Amino acid sequence: MTVTVPVITPTELKARLDAGNVPTLVDVRELYEADIADLPEHGQARIPTAEFADRFEELDRGQELVLYCRSGRRSEWAARILLENGYERVFNLKGGVLGWRNEVDPDLPAY
């Protein structure tokens, strides 16, 4: 059975951050990618995709988690792992960093 991963749009996430409703943002990109472009730091965790299957249990099951990568594909995969392992409050950032750039912050570098 395939698990459906809930999504949150960049605009929705920005509104929540601005309102003080801050989920844990989980960056699953490679470390060098964060040096190129990054989202505002609000309780971020960084677990690169290559390490995710071994390290996901570092994430607090009680927290709301929003996963992101460059375009949303790797973070969708990672979010699915969490959901399949009993995490409940998990969302994938639609479009990833590129979606954030398109909807929220056009000054963020594209890569």
Q: Residue ranges of each PLM-predicted region?
A:
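Rhodanese-like catalytic fold shared by cysteine-dependent sulfurtransferases
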Residues: 1-24, 30-64, 73-111
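Short, surface-exposed ligand- or partner-binding patches at beta-edge/loop junctions that are enriched
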Residues: 67-69
